[in-house]
Amino acid sequence: MSVLLIPATQRTPELAFDPDAGHLRIAGESFPEDVNAFFDGPMGRVNEWLDESQGPVLLDFQMIYLNSSSAKVFVKLLVRLDAQAALGRDCRVRWWHDAEDFNIRELGEEFRDRVDHLRFELCEVVAGDTHS
């Protein structure tokens, strides 16, 4: 399976998926006009990879803003990863948030509270730091 890179737009996040590394990054703003049209293809590839692979998974969220439709897509992904983690797979989520962005931090806390087995880290971005 090849690397997937969908650049961010004004309404959609960047999606970067490297199946060999087991790394998915979702970054930016997410309020697409048609959430299914935007996410179905990429999430289908991720789900296919989850079915075919047993390797570790790292999911980095670097969100600036997301609407409720995008949040539902993310919850479905987190539930799927949580089920994989319950079976013993190494699954980890890093939810990056700016130190001043309490709304995004709070949303990350809500997502974290929905999973039982998944390692879910809230990661504060410090000015000048870079991460991937």
Q: What are these model-predicted stretches?
A:
Residues 32, 101, 128:
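Surface-exposed, flexible loop/turn segments at secondary-structure boundaries
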Residues 2, 6, 105, 109-132:
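A cross-taxonomic marker for long C-terminal extensions/tails that follow the last structured domain
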Residues 48-52, 83-87, 113, 117:
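Secondary-structure boundary motif
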